[in-house]
């Protein structure tokens, strides 16, 4: 059975890529997340495709379990909509402190917000 993963070429890796995307346009802002983007440079052998970077700061989500859960939820939302998004480098950044909640409630609210952001960007 094929695995539904986010391939390495769909992620930002270098600090310069993150910096360029964070300096780019802010596309969406919600209760927890800001989505910034900049045009990506296509490789010689590959067409330009949407790529994702995540910035989840420890000061906003103190527990490692919470940070990893947020990253997992955001990556899954991006993977589901990656082909519908314009070919840009996206950075999703947590911008406010999370209120204490169960992981189930956190997953639900984070997924709803990120889905709304990516749906708006895809239009």
From Swiss-Prot:
**Reaction equations catalysed:** Endonucleolytic cleavage of RNA, removing 5'-extranucleotides from tRNA precursor
The UniProt entry, under InterPro entries, shows: Ribosomal_Su5_D2-typ_SF (IPR020568), Ribsml_uS5_D2-typ_fold_subgr (IPR014721), RNase_P (IPR000100), RNase_P_CS (IPR020539)
Question: A Gene Ontology CC term for this entry?
Answer: ribonuclease P complex
Keyword Cell wall biogenesis/degradation applies: no
Keywords of this protein's UniProt record, alphabetized? Endonuclease, Hydrolase, Nuclease, RNA-binding, tRNA processing
Q: Please verify whether the record's keywords include Hydrolase.
A: yes
Which GO-annotated molecular functions does the record name?
3'-tRNA processing endoribonuclease activity; ribonuclease P activity; tRNA binding
Any idea of its EC number?
A: 3.1.26.5
The record's section on Pfam families has: Ribonuclease_P
Mention one GO biological process in which this protein takes part, according to its record. Answer: tRNA 5'-leader removal
Chain's role: RNaseP catalyzes the removal of the 5'-leader sequence from pre-tRNA to produce the mature 5'-terminus. It can also cleave other RNA substrates such as 4.5S RNA. The protein component plays an auxiliary but essential role in vivo by binding to the 5'-leader sequence and broadening the substrate specificity of the ribozyme.
Q: How does it assemble?
A: Consists of a catalytic RNA component (M1 or rnpB) and a protein subunit.
Protein family per UniProt: Belongs to the RnpA family.
Task: Spell out the protein name for this chain.
Answer: Ribonuclease P protein component
Organism source for this protein?
A: Bordetella pertussis (strain Tohama I / ATCC BAA-589 / NCTC 13251)
Taxonomic lineage is: Bacteria, Pseudomonadati, Pseudomonadota, Betaproteobacteria, Burkholderiales
